[in-house]
Amino acid sequence: MVNLNKVQPRSGGDHYLALGIEGSANKLGVGILKHPMLSQHKQGSLSHDCQAEILSNIRDTYITPPGEGFLPRDTARHHRNWVVRLVRRALVEAGIEDPRLLDVICFTKGPGMGAPLHSVVVAARTMSMLWDVPLVAVNHCIGHIEMGREITKAENPVVLYVSGGNTQVIAYSENRYRIFGETLDIAIGNCLDRFARTLKIPNDPSPGYNIEQLAKQCKNKDRLVELPYTVKGMDLSMSGILAHIDSLAKDLFRRNTKNYKLFDRETGKQLVTVEDLCYSLQEHLFAMLVEITERAMAHVNSNQVLIVGGVGCNVRLQQMMASMCQSRADGQVHATDERFCIDNGVMIAQAGLLQYRMGDIVKDFSETVVTQRFRTDEVYVSWRD
């Protein structure tokens, strides 16, 4: 069994406290987490009885006007302006009067956007020096996985990680989260966000959420708009489907009646709405994800799927995955709500605290340099058998 007590609580008590800061994209999150030191852990074993207690989970999102994305420099400015306020709120909500009682400060090292990541690491270094608390550098993707495992209690699932910057099918083996399949170009969240910009729909609370709401309003669900479907073995491509549906949307707005996918050849009557496009886009993208996830489940002989990442909040994706799992013996789908699917600080605290308890801490600030490219399978998962 894994010994999770290589480092004892700094307070000498029966629990560990971790503060996590996430800021790899347009969401800035600060969370505080407590791990109890149960009797079985004192003997060196790890089980799901080690229930993490979430003391605070604060988040603020940098939102741009409809039709616009977010630039790294502007996002970084947002994070710098808000990080102190969020940390203070998190400490108050957690009931921590003296931050020196924290065992560890965890921050996102990557992957993500360079400037926002740098804003977060500067804040983490500053707090570490002010309060004399050690640092742990966390892989953003590992944070999503470990938070999902903790909340859902999924034992050893195939993980579908779907977000604005990542699309991966992952399974655990020999102390690594192995990537079985992934996008060959853009991530699914990026595909949805860019189509939302084409439609000029609001970015509040998020473009993907607003596309989901439009898709629910589709009245022609028995008639999909034909779109590219690109699955290559265990990998998939979404740039072609985005280019095609962007072209359709522009023809719809221009009322290009020569596009017979959208308008009746004889009468010129509009056949397709924006809601139809959103619905068809979701159905095609999610079908591709379900296909490669099922293939991974068959390969590793698993009957569980854990969906993590911001797009994992999508109810339709969860429904389609559940439908696939029902056709497999004892198939199960695990997912969390928007508190934990969307980027947050507490997921960084969870993964970081597991690393800390295994003795993985930053020994020098040179180890805190952030990186925009940080693969999920680069991390040695010492806290699992």
Swiss-Prot record:
Single Gene Ontology BP annotation: tRNA threonylcarbamoyladenosine modification
Cofactor binding remark: Binds 1 divalent metal cation per subunit.
Identification of the protein by name: tRNA N6-adenosine threonylcarbamoyltransferase
Catalytic activity: L-threonylcarbamoyladenylate + adenosine(37) in tRNA = N(6)-L-threonylcarbamoyladenosine(37) in tRNA + AMP + H(+)
HAMAP family linked to this entry: Kae1
Keywords of this entry: Activator, Acyltransferase, Cytoplasm, Metal-binding, Nucleus, Transcription, Transcription regulation, Transferase, tRNA processing
Cofactor entry: a divalent metal cation
NCBIfam families reported for this sequence: gcp_kae1 (TIGR00329)
Major subcellular location class: cytoplasm
Record EC number: 2.3.1.234
GO cellular component, one term: EKC/KEOPS complex
Gene designation: KAE1
GO MF terms, alphabetically ordered: chromatin DNA binding; metal ion binding; N(6)-L-threonylcarbamoyladenine synthase activity; nucleotidase activity
Subunit-level organization: Component of the EKC/KEOPS complex composed of at least BUD32, CGI121, GON7, KAE1 and PCC1; the whole complex dimerizes.
Positions annotated to bind substrate: 161-165, 193, 208, 212, 314
Chain sites annotated for binding a divalent metal cation: 140, 144, 161, 343
Homology family: Belongs to the KAE1 / TsaD family.
Protein purpose: Component of the EKC/KEOPS complex that is required for the formation of a threonylcarbamoyl group on adenosine at position 37 (t(6)A37) in tRNAs that read codons beginning with adenine. The complex is probably involved in the transfer of the threonylcarbamoyl moiety of threonylcarbamoyl-AMP (TC-AMP) to the N6 group of A37. KAE1 likely plays a direct catalytic role in this reaction, but requires other protein(s) of the complex to fulfill this activity. The EKC/KEOPS complex also promotes both telomere uncapping and telomere elongation.
PROSITE patterns: GLYCOPROTEASE
Signal peptide as annotated in the record: none
Enzyme type, top EC level: transferase
InterPro entries hit by this protein: ATPase_NBD, Gcp-like_dom, KAE1/TsaD, Kae1_archaea_euk, Peptidase_M22_CS
Source domain of life: Eukaryota
Subcellular location: Cytoplasm; Nucleus
